[in-house]
Amino acid sequence: MKVVEISHPMVKHKLGLMRAASISTQEFRRLTKEITSLLTYEVTAGFELEKIEILGWQGENIEIDQIKGKKLTVVPILRAGLGMMDGVFEHVPAAKVSMVGMYRDEKTAKPVAYFAKLCDKLDERVALIVDPMLATGGSMIATVSLLKKAGSKDIKIITLVSAPEGIDALAKAHPDVELYTASIDSHLNDKKYIIPGLGDAGDKIFGTK
């Protein structure tokens, strides 16, 4: 599995601010959007271009470069992934949106999809999953499996922080996906929180406890 930890100083600086215990909802939300925007720029760097012909400003036909294929679909994992969508839209404002909701079954401890609204022609699009944290990897693995079952063939993932345990699990389950993250953190604690991590990103984005 391709794993890219973005080392850009602006990404590291902004992520450092997000780790503060005293951070406000407004600041956490803003930084989530800004880092997602920077990561989206990195993800799209490898997109294939094609030449198309348009009518230029001089009234003559000219060739320009455009990204090849259908517009990507951004796939936020509910609910925290919603806070990352605007960062993607800054670079891909015409992106389609496919939403996936997961909950953990108390008996099996496995993620179960409770909601999925996917766009059409997934087999012709890049699917960009966004979720602030990759902890155990359970929800991410289930989301990738759901997308593949629906026809998706090109799946990329953006997270703000990732645990080594989650990366390993994802790589074993889906070695063909690509992961772009602002940080590979140290480990998971006994409560399955990423250390040093960000705390509960969903609560911090939406101002809940």
Curated annotation (Swiss-Prot):
Catalyzes the conversion of uracil and 5-phospho-alpha-D-ribose 1-diphosphate (PRPP) to UMP and diphosphate. Binds 1 Mg(2+) ion per subunit. The magnesium is bound as Mg-PRPP. One of its GO terms (molecular function) is GTP binding. One of its GO terms (biological process) is UMP salvage. The keyword Isomerase does not apply. InterPro entries: PRibTrfase_dom, PRTase-like, Upp_B, UPRTase/APRTase, Ura_phspho_trans. Allosterically activated by GTP. CDD domains: PRTases_typeI (cd06223). Belongs to the UPRTase family. NCBIfam families: PRK00129.1, upp. It is an enzyme of class 2 (transferase). Keywords: Allosteric enzyme, Glycosyltransferase, GTP-binding, Magnesium, Nucleotide-binding, Transferase. Its EC number is 2.4.2.9. 5-phospho-alpha-D-ribose 1-diphosphate binds at R79, R104, D131, P132, M133, L134, A135, T136, G137, G138, S139, D200. Its cofactor is Mg(2+). This is Uracil phosphoribosyltransferase. Pathway: Pyrimidine metabolism; UMP biosynthesis via salvage pathway; UMP from uracil: step 1/1. SUPFAM superfamilies: PRTase-like. It catalyses: UMP + diphosphate = 5-phospho-alpha-D-ribose 1-diphosphate + uracil. The keyword Transcription does not apply. Uracil binds at I194, G199, D200, A201.
